[in-house]
């Protein structure tokens, strides 16, 4: 879409009074979330309190595991649970997570809480800015504030700020990796390194970047990820030995599987296809099922990304193949509601700027896609608070329908973009110019 036309469309948002109102709405959203986090603050404890979850993910997944790592205690092992007030050892994150969060483990917990809340808020603002800039747009001050506020009020944005999960970091890394995969491989590799904190992000991301023919970016990113992981494991091994480190990692894996809240049958937040199917079937899959399903679910998207990448005009994060990649990452393997932040940048591009060319996707498909991607952002029905107040039967049809809606919408969105990629792959190359490739458009 033409930038001058977009400037005219969004001119009202840049009026000073409108900007002030938008800023007020943004500040109210951040303040209200901060107040809720304070009122329902999760005190350090060896048991999980579902009624007080304020910054619980930051405490249990970032602060104490990173503190343990810095002090030479294996954050994946039961030894961490014995030493710190935490209900469960760390999931199988890459050690890179503990390296880059190390500065946050230096101050006292309350001070670190404030710093991380502000950091998470800033990253939501960065995602809004990335959605505009990666659609090759500029000078949309009012729109940026509006999008920033939308993210703060959105379901994944709110829960990210409230529980203190580090989702925004993983999302920013993934988007950077996809946006610069064709043009700036080293920067793309750095994005991969940031996304490598959680295997459920980086593993499908690597495969899809390869299918997109971003070979140099993958090579650089793999080198950085392996180096970062080895440095972290080497640090832990220096306090014990490699076998103890491996044993501790296995303890963390078993602790995750032993947590009933992680079962698809019990959760109200799962987005991935296996999670949705397992909920309906009352089935608890194991690691091999998740990994095998991911590989199967990557086949068709990967093949169509390979074919479509030869013809696509927008090779940035808001283009067709990047949108396929983001959706495939979410539906192919274990993900929760907060992970739908991964769709924010493509959603902004598609909804506000028509970032996928009409030659690649008809208007009806783009509008349908924009609505489907908005559902996980706006769906506050699939929350513990609503489900409890509504008194729904966890095994009932209504409960299953509400809690499966996000995953179903993402899967339908994936079908639409895969259909568009297949149509594009059958066309004669539309002569993509070097300038378009360099700009990501």
What residue spans do the PLM features occupy?
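Hydrophobic transmembrane alpha-helices
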Residues: 108, 195, 346-347
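Aromatic-enriched
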Residues: 353-441
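A cytosolic-side transmembrane-helix exit/cap motif
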Residues: 167, 188-189, 239-247, 342-344, ...
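Membrane-embedded alpha-helical segments of transport systems
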Residues: 121, 197-199, 227-231, 375-379
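Voltage-sensor/pore transmembrane module of 6-TM cation channels
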Residues: 186-212
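Hydrophobic/aromatic-rich transmembrane helices and adjacent perimembrane loops
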Residues: 336-353
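Primarily membrane-embedded glycan-assembly and transfer machineries that use lipid-linked glycans
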Residues: 2-187, 209-340, 397-401, 427-441
């Amino acid at each position: 879409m033409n930038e001058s036309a977009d400037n005219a469309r969004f001119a009202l948002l840049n009026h000073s009074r409108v900007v002030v109102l938008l800023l007020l709405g943004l500040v109210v959203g951040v303040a209200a979330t901060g107040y809720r986090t304070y009122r329902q603050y999760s005190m350090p404890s060896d048991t999980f309190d579902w009624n007080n979850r304020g910054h619980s993910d930051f405490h249990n997944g970032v602060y104490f595991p990173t503190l343990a790592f810095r002090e030479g205690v294996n954050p994946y092992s039961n030894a961490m649970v014995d030493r710190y007030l935490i209900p469960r050892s760390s999931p199988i994150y890459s050690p890179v997570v503990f390296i880059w969060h190390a500065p946050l483990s230096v101050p006292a917990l309350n001070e670190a809480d404030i710093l991380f809340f502000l950091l998470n808020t800033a990253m939501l603002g960065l995602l809004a800015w990335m959605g505009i800039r990666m659609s090759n747009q500029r000078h949309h001050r009012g729109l940026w504030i509006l999008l920033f506020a939308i993210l703060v009020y959105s379901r994944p944005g709110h829960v990210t700020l409230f529980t203190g999960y580090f989702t925004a970091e993983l999302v920013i890394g993934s988007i950077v990796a996809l946006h610069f995969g064709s043009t700036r491989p080293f920067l793309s590799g750095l994005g991969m390194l940031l996304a490598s904190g959680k295997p459920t992000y980086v593993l499908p991301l690597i495969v899809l970047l390869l299918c997109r023919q971003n070979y140099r970016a993958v090579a650089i990113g793999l080198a950085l990820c392996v180096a970062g992981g080895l440095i972290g494991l080497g640090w832990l091994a220096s306090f014990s030995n490699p076998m103890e480190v491996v044993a501790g990692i296995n303890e963390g894996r078993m602790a995750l599987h032993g947590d009933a809240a992680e079962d698809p049958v019990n959760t109200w937040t799962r987005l991935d296809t296996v999670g949705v199917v397992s909920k309906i079937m009352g089935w608890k899959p194991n690691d091999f099922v998740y990994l095998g399903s991911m590989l199967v679910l990557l086949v068709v998207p990967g093949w169509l990304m390979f074919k479509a990448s030869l013809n696509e005009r927008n090779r940035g994060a808001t283009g067709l193949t990047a949108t396929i990649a983001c959706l495939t990452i979410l539906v192919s393997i274990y993900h929760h509601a907060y992970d739908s932040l991964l769709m924010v940048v493509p959603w902004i591009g598609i909804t506000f700027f028509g970032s996928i060319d009409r030659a690649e996707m008809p208007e009806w498909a783009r509008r349908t896609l924009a609505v489907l991607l908005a559902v996980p952002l706006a769906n506050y029905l699939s929350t513990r608070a609503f489900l409890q107040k509504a008194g729904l039967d966890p095994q009932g049809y209504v409960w299953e329908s509400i809690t499966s809606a996000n995953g179903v919408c993402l899967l339908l969105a994936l079908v639409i973009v895969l259909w568009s990629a297949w149509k594009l792959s059958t066309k004669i190359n539309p002569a993509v110019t070097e300038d378009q490739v360099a700009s990501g458009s």
